[in-house]
Design a protein with these regions (language model features):
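Catalytic-site microenvironment of enzymes
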Residues: 1-251
Length: 251
């Protein structure tokens, strides 16, 4: 009897030892799993940080920043840019004129107390879809795209502003106010307000317009569009039209 009791006790002890060993192994594996997971998470965080840092350093003035979502009252879109020069005449590129006018307009609007975002602040390329998406993410009140015109015969002249029939009804009002205000400032030929279903007008979710500030292919207008004082007049006209628009929707 004593021998059998000893055998049972011995067997029980061996079973307990195996169970303890399994528990220790399980705890060890859980511990190692936690360590490995922590290392992977830390690596991902560090890797992500350097990716964002590299992007920010290589795009210091590119406001198409997917890591910012602060709201803006107004989006100004400087047409073309980077590999897309837009219209070109006598080595003068549309992308340079539109950027200069956009920056001048931005300063005027900010001085009037509005929060303004711009699709580009330097010579960078942005797709049309990116421009529209940026404006939508910013939840802006209005979107104004600034361009220069061209014609094959070089005779085209004047300023015109477009809105889309698929955009909000108030886009027409915005287009008319901006068009009239620019004409008042510049005394340029009034080509009036027209409809056009451009990508940036159709895919934006706020009243949106596109301003053609003059013809680069027209020698006289090309000279004017390259002049800093004339650009200021256009910028003032765009600003005046926007301010009048906001006055009308406040009434």
């Amino acid at each position: 009897m004593q021998k059998n009791h000893y055998q049972r006790t011995s067997n029980l002890t061996n079973t307990q030892k195996r169970r303890k060993k399994k528990r220790r192994r399980r705890k060890f594996l859980q511990f190692m799993g936690t360590i490995i997971l922590s290392v992977l998470i830390l690596t991902a965080v560090i890797f992500g940080y350097f990716i964002i840092r590299h992007y920010r350093e290589s795009h210091p003035d590119d406001l198409l920043d997917h890591f910012r979502f602060n709201r803006a009252d107004i989006i100004l879109d400087a047409g073309h840019g980077g590999k897309d020069p837009g219209a070109v005449a006598n080595d003068i590129s549309e992308k340079d004129i539109t950027l200069s006018i956009s920056l001048k307009t931005k300063d005027l609007l900010e001085n009037a107390g509005y929060k303004v975002a711009i699709t580009r602040k330097e010579d960078t390329f942005l797709s049309l879809d990116d421009r529209a998406s940026y404006a939508n993410r910013k939840k802006a009140n209005i979107f104004v795209s600034i361009h220069c015109n061209s014609s094959e015969d070089g005779e085209g002249k004047g300023i015109e502003t477009f809105y889309s029939e698929y955009n909000e009804e108030s886009a027409k009002n915005l287009a008319e106010l901006i068009q009239n205000s620019i004409i008042e400032q510049t005394a340029a030929k009034d080509r009036e307000v027209k409809t056009a279903n451009y990508t940036v007008l159709v895919r934006t979710k706020m009243p949106s317009v596109l301003v053609e500030t003059g013809f680069l292919t027209n020698e006289t207008e090309r000279s004017l569009l390259s002049d800093d004082d004339y650009q200021k007049k256009i910028a003032q006209g765009i600003t005046d039209g926007i301010l009048k628009y906001f006055d009308t929707i406040k009434e």
